[in-house]
């Protein structure tokens, strides 16, 4: 840290004024600025050492924690995103209450799957990127602009991904120009695709997607959409050991975010608890079975 301070001070003049790079007009991208001024602190510039294993000899030693299942669903007024709370390192549970869904600005959010530490760092940098743009331009970045900017950041991580440290976010938000909720999925190269109705990423995504295909329907209310998201995470946890289900003993619930024209809000745990209990009650006696449309929507399947 001391060396870093000395490096910055050497680039300033004796009057204590900011370096010229801070005052020169240029891109409204914070990442572009850092790449020009101090590129070594960007995650994309790092490389793994020849021996990357971490100390320790137990199961999962040498493996970084991985975040797993994220689901996103469009509903009548916007979009819902939910993520389980488990992080794994090999066969071990590394963390039981990790947060995988983050607000990125007033009208968008992102969920993370893949290498947890790098994924969280990427989303934090993305948050700063959007805030920096807003301060310089005096307006929010468009939904398309945000999706493209995140794509560029994922592509910059390709070197780490090819070494086994992939980051695969899921981006969603309310498009103020289009007046609707939207979901964008990515691959490890930064390739992006518009996802319609719903999408899932992570190790349990196959099982969550199967659940969503049965339970999702267009035009659902916010409450129905939250319930369907929790049902999908339950199905993922039921078949994927890296996805954590609701922890009733510790009262650890999935993180659920809702984004509408009014903005983003995280659904409070107190609001989620009765919904989780309803999901558990609906699966009692048939934990692996589908609760059915009528159980979720309360309409007898009509």
Swiss-Prot record:
GO terms for molecular function: threonine-type endopeptidase activity. The keyword Cytoplasm applies. SUPFAM superfamilies: N-terminal nucleophile aminohydrolases (Ntn hydrolases) (SSF56235). It is found in: Cytoplasm. Keywords: Autocatalytic cleavage, Cytoplasm, Hydrolase, Protease, Proteasome, Threonine protease, Zymogen. InterPro entries: Ntn_hydrolases_N (IPR029055), Pept_T1A_subB (IPR000243), Proteasome_sua/b (IPR001353), Proteasome_suB-type (IPR023333), PSB_actinobac (IPR022483). One of its GO terms (biological process) is modification-dependent protein catabolic process. It is an enzyme of class 3 (hydrolase). Residues 1-67 form a propeptide. Its EC number is 3.4.25.1. The active site is at 68 (nucleophile). Pfam families: Proteasome. Gene3D superfamilies: Glutamine Phosphoribosylpyrophosphate, subunit 1, domain 1. It catalyses: Cleavage of peptide bonds with very broad specificity. The formation of the proteasomal ATPase ARC-20S proteasome complex, likely via the docking of the C-termini of ARC into the intersubunit pockets in the alpha-rings, may trigger opening of the gate for substrate entry. Interconversion between the open-gate and close-gate conformations leads to a dynamic regulation of the 20S proteasome proteolysis activity. Residues 1-21, 283-302 are annotated as: Disordered. Pathway: Protein degradation; proteasomal Pup-dependent pathway. The 20S proteasome core is composed of 14 alpha and 14 beta subunits that assemble into four stacked heptameric rings, resulting in a barrel-shaped structure. The two inner rings, each composed of seven catalytic beta subunits, are sandwiched by two outer rings, each composed of seven alpha subunits. The catalytic chamber with the active sites is on the inside of the barrel. Has a gated structure, the ends of the cylinder being occluded by the N-termini of the alpha-subunits. Is capped by the proteasome-associated ATPase, ARC. Belongs to the peptidase T1B family. HAMAP family: Proteasome_B_B. Component of the proteasome core, a large protease complex with broad specificity involved in protein degradation. This is Proteasome subunit beta. The lineage of its organism: Bacteria, Bacillati, Actinomycetota, Actinomycetes, Kineosporiales.
């Amino acid at each position: 840290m001391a060396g870093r301070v000395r490096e910055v001070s050497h680039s300033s003049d004796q009057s204590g004024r900011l370096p010229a790079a801070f005052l020169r007009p240029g891109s409204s991208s914070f990442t572009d600025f850092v790449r020009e001024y101090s590129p070594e602190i960007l995650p994309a510039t790092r490389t793994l050492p020849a021996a990357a294993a971490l100390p320790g000899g137990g199961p999962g030693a040498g493996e970084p924690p991985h975040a797993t299942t994220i689901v996103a669903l469009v509903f009548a007024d916007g979009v819902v995103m939910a993520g389980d709370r488990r992080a794994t390192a090999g066969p071990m549970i590394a963390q039981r209450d990790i947060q995988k869904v983050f607000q990125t600005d007033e009208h968008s959010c992102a969920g993370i799957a893949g290498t947890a530490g790098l994924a969280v760092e990427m989303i934090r940098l993305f948050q700063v990127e959007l805030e920096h743009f807003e301060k310089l331009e005096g307006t929010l970045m468009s939904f398309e602009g945000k999706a493209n900017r995140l794509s560029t950041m994922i592509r910059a991580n390709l070197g780490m991904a090819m070494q086994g440290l992939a980051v695969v976010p899921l981006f969603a938000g309310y498009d103020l120009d289009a007046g609707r909720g939207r979901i964008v999925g990515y691959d490890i190269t930064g390739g992006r695709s518009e996802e319609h109705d719903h999408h899932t990423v992570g190790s349990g995504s196959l099982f969550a997607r199967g659940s969503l295909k049965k339970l999702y329907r267009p035009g659902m209310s916010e409450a129905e959409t939250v319930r369907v998201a929790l049902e999908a995470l339950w199905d993922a946890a039921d078949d994927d050991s890296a996805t954590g289900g609701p922890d009733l003993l510790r009262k650890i619930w999935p993180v659920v975010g809702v984004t509408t024209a009014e903005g983003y809000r995280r659904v409070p745990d107190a609001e989620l608890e009765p919904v989780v209990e309803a999901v558990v009650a609906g699966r009692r006696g048939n934990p692996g079975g589908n609760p059915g449309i009528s159980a979720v929507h309360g309409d007898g399947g009509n």
